[in-house]
């Protein structure tokens, strides 16, 4: 049982997932700080210091904190937009690298061209035999 667990726990996919979760949590903290400490105060200045967190409806001793809910939705939208922009920039950078790699492919040598022609001729011969 222990050996099976070790095989499972140390597979590449599991370790990749663990690293992704840790990095994702750290990135989430960065984005949350961006929203809380930079974007929200700037929007507060633009919107005249609007703060939804204090909005509530009180029924006796119970309070419905709908302002916090609105603020949470607002934070989510900002976080989602920030992550979207990050992923968009990341994808653009990786696609440029892939394009550069494709451009770096060398021209086929004479031997490779001849081997390709032989392959094509063999395919033609095999397809004509199949038809007959």
From Swiss-Prot:
Keywords: Cell membrane, Ion channel, Ion transport, Membrane, Transmembrane, Transmembrane helix, Transport. The chain crosses the membrane at residues 14-34, 38-58, 69-89. It comes from the Bacteria. It is found in: Cell membrane. The keyword Transport applies. The keyword Cell membrane applies. Homopentamer. This is Large-conductance mechanosensitive channel. It comes from Bacillus thuringiensis (strain Al Hakam). The gene is mscL.
């Amino acid at each position: 049982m222990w050996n099976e667990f070790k095989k499972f726990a140390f597979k590449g996919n599991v370790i990749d997932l663990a690293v992704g979760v840790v990095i994702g949590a750290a990135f989430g903290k960065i984005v949350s700080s961006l929203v809380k400490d930079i974007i929200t105060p700037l929007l507060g200045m633009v919107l005249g210091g609007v703060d939804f967190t204090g909005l509530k409806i009180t029924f006796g001793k119970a309070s419905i904190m709908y302002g916090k809910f609105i603020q949470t939705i607002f934070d989510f939208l900002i976080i989602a937009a920030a992550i979207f922009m990050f992923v968009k920039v990341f994808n653009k950078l990786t696609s440029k690298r892939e394009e550069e790699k494709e451009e770096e492919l060398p021209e086929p040598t004479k031997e490779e061209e001849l081997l390709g022609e032989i392959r094509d001729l063999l395919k033609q011969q095999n397809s004509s035999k199949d038809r007959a």
